[in-house]
Amino acid sequence: MKYLSTLFLFCTLFFVGCATNTNLERSQEPLRSYPVFMTDGQQSAVFKAEALAGNYKANFILMLNAAYEGEKQIKILGDYAAVLMKATFKDGAFTYQYLPQDLFDKVALSVFEDTLKNLLAEPKDFKKYKVKQDNTLISFKSGKFLNTYYFKQGDKYPYQMKQSKGLINKDFYFDDYRLFNGKQVPYRILVSEAKGRVAIELTLLSLK
């Protein structure tokens, strides 16, 4: 009986391992590419941004610049190039040098930070591969969230990503992929908080 139990455990682990490897292989076939910026040697990215939070609407310029040892410098510019926010991002954490209290409320700041986290780092912690109707779904763990990318069958680039954790959900939409400085990236990105409280639309102006 002990021998049979050991054999059963070995077979279970073997098949789980095979399934995991198969999922990992399938998740990269055809080789997928994810909408991230400044991960292939690019030094700067500039977006035109529009943010909606309740009845409040704001237009601004979002500037991202590479610094030392993987650090990213972040600036938000308003009218007449006035600096509205200044921060750095490294290893998944933000450090703010300048952030007026009335620029973002708590929900809007959370959506803004989650947007940048997903656009500045490649997804790594693979969780699941699934084919559903005409879509391929590939999920990764990202901090406390599960990020699920949606690909149309045969496509290399995703058109949508759903970020979820319990009742906290966001939708990312990637539209109009174009070649910028040798890298294929979405020209427009829309991020919407599931309860409709906050939405951010980014239009890529340059990637160098």
For the regions a language model picked out, list residue spans one by one.
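Sec-dependent bacterial lipoprotein signal peptides
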Residues: 1-18
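N-terminal leader/targeting segments and the immediate start of mature chains
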Residues: 17-65, 70-71, 102-106
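Extended lipid/amphipathic-ligand handling interfaces
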Residues: 62-66, 87, 174-179
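Membrane-embedded segments
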Residues: 78-83
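Short Lys/Arg-rich amphipathic alpha-helical segments
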Residues: 84-85, 100
